[in-house]
């Protein structure tokens, strides 16, 4: 009777999923063997996804072939309940383990290339963007560029635009002082009479600059009268449009990049020579536009140089030596007249 009970226990273990005793333990059973068989069965089920359990139960552990991992071996499935012969139908669908480190998902294949590169966050789009400072933008286009565009355009003669100056120019002290001095000098040369109206701004500095310009400019006109006449005939100035076209000549004077007070005073002196011509042909109304053209090109294109030279104060200081020589000449002439030296000394100091 004891043998019958033992056989019943063995059959019960086989039915409930226990280890095969005939092959694995040589016909003997113990609590340690059952635990070992149960652990081996659970390991086999986990590695095989629950589908290899029947093969292990039906045969011996040594006779079963080695388990081959399927391509989806990384899929995790719940182990089957004890006594179940197949996988648990109540288990959730297996999920694929994501072993990649957490990072931003890469774009799909069809978006690789320029489309994928275009995907940017708002922070990336604004990174490195710096608005252009307003103070660095020029208030007006340099006059030299305007002259170049006008001269290269179809049907244009290189004349300056007749638009009024902006507010920045009206408040420009260097431009205002230059226009006042040049305009006064050209009018006085054309009419041959002194203007009694006082100069604005810094009256002492402007008056000194005007006196220096009159002295030096008159000498330039006397020394280069023949050259000025040839230039005037070539330009054939008759009206205001011709006066504005002088800007091309003025720009050409400084085209080689050399700037000095000698060139500047020669330019203004030629303007005074043209002003006399305009007076002779009853075109006095063109004298003011002529002064504006000279001032525009001079101040707009040579502003940095003029500022470094201290403007009209530097102009007066530069020709101060010439003024000293003029004073010495006057003293010598007076002495020669008193002493009766004669015309020989006057010729030498001329």
Curated annotation (Swiss-Prot):
Membrane topology, as annotated, equals: Single-pass membrane protein
Q: Which domain of life is it from?
A: Eukaryota
Q: Using the UniProt annotation, give all residue ranges assigned to the region (PEST-like).
A: 104-175
Q: Name one GO molecular function term.
A: channel activity
Annotated segments matching region Disordered:
23-95, 150-169
Its Gene Ontology cellular component terms are: cytosol; membrane; mitochondrial outer membrane; nucleoplasm
Where found in the cell? Membrane; Cytoplasm; Mitochondrion; Nucleus, Nucleoplasm
Site entry: Cleavage: 127-128, 157-158
This protein is called what?
Induced myeloid leukemia cell differentiation protein Mcl-1 homolog
Identify the species of origin.
Canis lupus familiaris
Instruction: Give the lineage.
Output: Eukaryota, Metazoa, Chordata, Craniata, Vertebrata
């Amino acid at each position: 009777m004891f043998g019958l009970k033992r056989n019943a226990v063995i059959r019960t273990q086989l039915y409930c999923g226990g280890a095969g005793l005939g092959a694995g333990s040589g016909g003997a059973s113990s609590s340690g063997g059952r635990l070992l068989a149960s652990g081996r069965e659970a390991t086999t089920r986990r590695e095989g996804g629950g589908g290899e359990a029947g093969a292990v139960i039906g045969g011996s552990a040594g006779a079963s072939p080695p388990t081959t991992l399927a391509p989806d071996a990384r899929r995790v499935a719940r182990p089957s309940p004890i006594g179940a012969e197949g996988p648990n139908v109540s288990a959730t669908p297996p999920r694929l383990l994501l072993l990649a480190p957490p990072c931003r998902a890469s774009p799909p294949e069809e978006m690789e290339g320029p489309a994928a590169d275009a995907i940017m966050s708002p922070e990336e789009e604004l990174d490195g963007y710096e608005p252009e400072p307003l103070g660095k933008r020029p208030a007006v286009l340099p006059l030299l560029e305007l002259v170049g565009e006008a001269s290269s355009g179809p049907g244009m003669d290189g004349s300056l635009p007749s638009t009024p100056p902006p507010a920045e120019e009206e408040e420009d002290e260097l431009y205002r002082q230059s226009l006042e001095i040049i305009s006064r000098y050209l009018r006085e040369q054309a009419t041959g009479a002194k203007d009694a109206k006082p100069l604005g701004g810094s009256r002492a500095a402007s008056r000194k600059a005007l006196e220096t310009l009159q002295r030096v400019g008159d000498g330039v006109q006397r020394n280069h009268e023949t050259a000025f006449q040839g230039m005037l005939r070539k330009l054939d100035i008759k009206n205001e449009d011709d006066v504005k076209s002088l800007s091309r000549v003025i720009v050409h004077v400084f085209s080689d990049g050399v700037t000095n007070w000698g060139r500047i005073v020669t330019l203004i002196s030629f303007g005074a020579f043209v002003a006399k011509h305009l007076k002779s042909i009853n075109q006095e109304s063109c004298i003011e536009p002529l002064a504006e053209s000279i001032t525009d090109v001079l101040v707009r294109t040579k502003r940095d140089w003029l500022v470094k030279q201290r403007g009209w104060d530097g102009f007066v200081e530069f020709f101060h030596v010439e003024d000293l020589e003029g004073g010495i000449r006057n003293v010598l002439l007076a002495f020669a007249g008193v002493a009766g030296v004669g015309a020989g000394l006057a010729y030498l100091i001329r």
